[in-house]
Amino acid sequence: MKNQTTKRSSFSGKIGFVLSAAGASVGLGNIWRFPYLAAKYGGGIFLLIYIILALTFGYTMIMAETSLGRMTKKSPVGAFASFGNSRWSSLGGWINAIIPVLIVPYDSVIGGWVLKYLVEYVRGHAQPVAEDGYFSAFISDGFSTEICFVIFSVITLAIIYAGVRNGIERVSKFMMPILVVLSVIIAIYSVTRPGALAGVKYFLVPNISNFSWMTVVAAMGQMFYSLSIAMGILITFGSYMKKETSIEESTKNVEIFDTAIAIMAGLMIIPAVFAFSGGDPDTLQAGPALMFITIPKVFASMGFGTFAGVMFFLLVLFAALTSSIALTESAVSTFEDELGWSRKKSTVLCGVIMIALGSLSSLGYGPLANVKIIGMQFLDFFDFLTNSVMMPIAAIATCLFVSRVVGVKRIEEEVTYGGGTFKRRKVFLFMIQYLCPIFAGIILLSSVANAFGWISM
């Protein structure tokens, strides 16, 4: 392995890493994506499969990526290249580096939508945003969506510009505790609504009759998105981790944080939907629109829906920011390492890419609505490309790279450095060498085949 001598930024300690990594995980993936997938794909059975995958596949990938980052002190491309040139190092390094560059633009578009809704609730417009057609009218208005998207992007870039400790870590330490408190308050409020207990049961109690292969595919895709694996973030954050920080303990804390917020998000939204609609199947199948169409209707039916709306969308805004910050940092770190640029110059370049690609997604439901890629709007296509295609490929490349090039013994040495624990060592070894690459390959083929209509799931 090539030596790394360049002075590199770092987190102040375990708390800084955990909150920043958790912030990457606890983003729109948990608050926006997880509840609508759980509602759509069987509730409790989806949750059970997700937890099993997170504790096995997710654990393995977090450990591998964080270890790679810490032992090399480099972003994805450099981390993979540190062990020589091979097809796995080239593929693994660059695909991990490119994924965040493609995700953060459309992630920021959704962040802009959240910002718009928060402003409307602060202005006391709980009833107008709940009206039929409001959301579709908003996203089809290219000017409004573009302005909201740009404002959200500028906030993200300003935090990245400030650096690791002054920007990312400081913001994560501020926002994550508030996010947890807001989650608990809203979840308690939601589950105490009349008729909500049926939603709690649907979400928490597995029903095998709701199981399908698509439930597994959806849970797997959500795990990639939610835990921020196979997208270079954990390699980048691992490169900022101090040697004395326990990788396994940090991984466990991220798992707990992520799963707890995912469950809390489900309890915020699904019981409220049941209380409002009685568990209407069409409402549960609403998909991505669940948060922007159904939830405002739920709030409008409440006595103090404006307050609930402000609290909820403030929470979602914080979650959106933490994930966009992590994604942007991964991209900026790659520019710094591979191009030798300063953080300021790298942030500006990343900003240009964000605005250019994000504008396609932002305008994709308005002026560019007739422009589609394989039948998908720009935002849907970028989500499919990254989540269903590139992330499984990145996971396969990372697994093969770790097991065949780096060697699992090196990972074990990095994890146990300074007396660090490796309690799930056997799980890690079996998953990284066998199950993870095979399972990721099956998910990749299933997702592509389903998208092109070759199979129906």
Task: Describe each region flagged by the PLM.
Residues K2-K7, F11, E169, K173-L321, ...:
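Membrane-embedded translocation segments of transport machinery
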Residues M1-W32, M61-T66, R70-F83, R87-L91, ...:
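Membrane-interface "cap" regions at the ends of multi-pass membrane proteins
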Residues G13-L53, G238, E249-K252, I256-T259, ...:
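Transmembrane helix-boundary motif of multi-pass solute transporters/channels
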Residues T5-R8, Y36-Y41, K74-I95, S108-R165, ...:
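Inter-helical loop and helix-membrane interface segments of multi-pass membrane transporters/permeases
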Residues A38-A64, S144, M390-A394:
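Extracellular loop-to-transmembrane helix junctions
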Residues K2-Q4, G111-S140, M241-E244, E249, ...:
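Helix-loop-helix connectors at the membrane interface of multi-pass transporters/channels
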Residues S10-A21, I45-I49, R87-V101, I147-F152, ...:
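Select transmembrane alpha-helical segments in multipass membrane proteins
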Residues L379-L400, R424-M457:
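A generic transmembrane alpha-helix motif of multi-pass inner-membrane proteins
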